[in-house]
Each structure stands twice: as structure tokens, then as C-alpha cells.
Amino acid sequence: MKKLLILGANPETVSLILKAKELGYYTIVTDYDPHAYAKSFADQAENVDAIDSDALIELALREHVDGVLVGVAEALLPTYCEVCKRLDLPCYSTVDKFGIMARKDYFKQKCREYDVPTIKEYRYDELEEGCYPVIVKPVDSCSSKGIRICYNKEDVENAIPYALRYSKSRKYLIEEYMVGDEVVSYYVMQEGTPIFVGMCDRYTYKEKGDLVQLPNSYIFPSVHIDSYINYTDAAVKKMIRGLGLENGSLFFQCIVDKEGIARIYESGYRLNGAQEHLLISRVSGIDVKKLYIDMAVNGKVSDLDLESMANPKPLKLTCKLSPLVHTGKIKSIAGLDEINRLPCVVSVNPSYREGDIVAGEGTLKQIFCRFYIVASQKKILKDTIDQIHNLLSVKDVNGQEMLFGLFDTSIIDDRY
């Protein structure tokens, strides 16, 4: 049995581990945290720090691994590249390309070079009364960490040190704070060919004034998909080719402006923590997890013609529902088994167990679970989400309900 070494063991890595096991591989997962969530799903769990390349090499040689994978943690990509290179194992890209796509400032510069619509930036000394509100963020962080919305210069002065706390390079970005629909577009690359595979509407809930909005639902296909295909897709594909991104997957977070044009502000050149691949595989047969696994072992993502399989405008509605919870310690969780038995629910991916502590207010750490739904009609989708909301309960040590900001299903009637 061939062995795969998977770097990082956060909850979002579980689906990758399960897919590798389904395909017949022996899975070794490593993370410095001995209690990391995904470890219990692997065949073998190690406590080697996934940024310690020397220790990872030693582990890989000792276990005679046949391929190396990284889960969803962007910070592990440079180590992943080094480990693959030193072991002479396939790697889906290079450190310099990961660096461009992971650094928000570098990435946005490439967007401008290739005429990809993006969001206006400001230097600190350019800020004037008419610029506000703006958003301050680290150039090299993810999962909504280090981000603040600012309504005046004093807010900006307070937000900059906060952003720098989450920036390895000690750099920040100031952008126009756009109000509009949020969308996410998805691509896979096969031997240099970029393939548009899906696009969703990203719905969010905003709890406090200076905190960013957190996603509580993604719905495919996006109501803006035709506009995206007409105004943005060609430029994005040109950029992907120009940057030499040969294999793997990409996601782009965008805001739709008043003219209906999707403006890209962030990218991810990896498996997405939102795990939209669980839905895209259901409507197209393209399973991004399998592409990464095949690349790790065989050096190519697929022998299939992925472009002919792509189905970015499926007839079915699909949804990633991600209920939010307040910070605190979880005492009890109810409803997951019943939800898992609902006919349209194709996957249930919790982030926490009873006894876990939810920290990181205003970040994606407040997502309690991700539910994946495939429905043939919008009424069925709406009813399924309402059922999930009614069944699910997460209570803290004081017996208080921790769930908040649930997705408003009336939106489905209004927009789809």
C-alpha cells in the first residue's frame, strides 16, 4: 500500500484524508499539536511540526512515503515545496508562484498587469475624508485574521499595528471598503490549461462595527456568473497562463461593483478551507482532492479531460452552510446525526467537539461546522437549511446557545 504524508491536521483537512483512504492510500498526518482535530481520521498521526522541513524529511524517509500533500494551510506551502524537492517527489507548483498568490500586494499587482478587475488601494499618506470607509489587512495572512474596517484616520492608526501582528513580512494593505455582493470563483489547472469550474454567492453576517463579515452560506451557481464569464473570466485565465500556474486549484474572492463586475481582492492557490470541492465534485465529477492526490503520487493531476467535464452552471442548487458560534467553551452539541441523515445533505464537517474552546473572535475560527447540500429545486434547498437550523444546537458551559447569525433563507426565494 502506498503511503501519503499530509502536512497539517486542522478540521478542514479531514475530507482530504478520507479521500486518500478511499482511494486505497495509507495516510500519515503530522501536526505539532498532539490533539489536532484531523489526526484521529488518519491511519497514522505524528507530532512533527509541519514547518520543520528537516524533521519532515526524516519522517518521510523513515516511513518510505510515496507522496506529500498539504491540507488547506497556506503557511505550510513553502515547507511543502522544500520537502518535495529534497525527496524528489512531485510538487504541484513552486515557492515563487505560491509567494505571488499568497501575498495580497503581489497578487493585486499581477491583477493590474493582466487587466483583472480588482479593488482600489491607498497608501497611508493618500487617505482623505472621502476615502472612508477603508479596510486594513495584513498582506500575508488568511482566515480573516488581522483585518479591521476603518471609518476615519484614527481607526486606521489603531488597525495598522493589529494587522502587523498577523503579518510575517510586517506589511499591511489599505483598500477601499466596497459594499456589494460577494462571490468566489473556482478554477483547476491541468498541464497549463486553466478551467473555470464554479462560482458561488458568499453570504455573510456582521456582528460588530470594526470586525469583518463572516460567511454563513455559499450558494452555487452564483447569480452573477454570466457577468463574470463576460467581463472577468478571460482576463483571469490569461493571468493564470502568464504566471505559469500549471496544476492544482485556485479560488478568487471578489466583490461585485455597481456595474455588476466582479472585482477580485484575494486568491488561494491550494485546497480551500471552505471545501467547495465537495459540491463541485457532485455536479461535475471533478474531485479536486483526487487531483492533488494523483499529482502527489503520479506527477499529473488527471488522465481525464477535465475541461470537458467542467459544469460551472449546474441545474442543481448547491450550498455550503456554515453556522457561526460565539467564542467560549462548548459543553454540548446536538443535532449532527439527524442532519447527516437528511436526504440532500452530502457531507457534515464539524470544526469542534464537545469540550473544545472557540477562540479568535471575528475570524473563521467562529465557523462551528460546514454542511454541504445538493438540491434539485430552490424550495428543497430552503427547507433543508431551515431543518438544519432547527435541529442544530451548540451550548456553552453556562447552558447558553452559542449559535448566532444564521443564514436568512428568504434570500433563496428572492434571488434564485
Regions found by a protein language model. Name each.
Residues 117-119, 133, 147-181, 199-200, ...:
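Conserved ATP-binding module of the ATP-grasp superfamily
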Residues 45-51, 121-124, 150:
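Short acidic-hydrophobic, aromatic-tinged amphipathic segments that line or gate anion-handling sites
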Residues 301-343:
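A glycine-rich beta-turn/hairpin centered on an aromatic-Pro dipeptide
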Residues 1-97, 299-302, 308, 313, ...:
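ATP-binding N-terminal substructure of ATP-dependent carboxylate-amine bond-forming enzymes
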Residues 250, 263, 339-356:
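A structural supersecondary motif
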Residues 177-179, 187-245, 249, 256, ...:
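ATP-dependent carboxylate/phosphate-activation module, predominantly the ATP-grasp catalytic core
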Residues 175, 246-258, 304-307, 403-408:
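A short glycine-rich, hydrophobically flanked beta-strand micro-motif that places a catalytic Asp/Glu
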Residues 85-146, 153:
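A conserved helix-loop-beta module that forms one wall/lid of the active-site cleft
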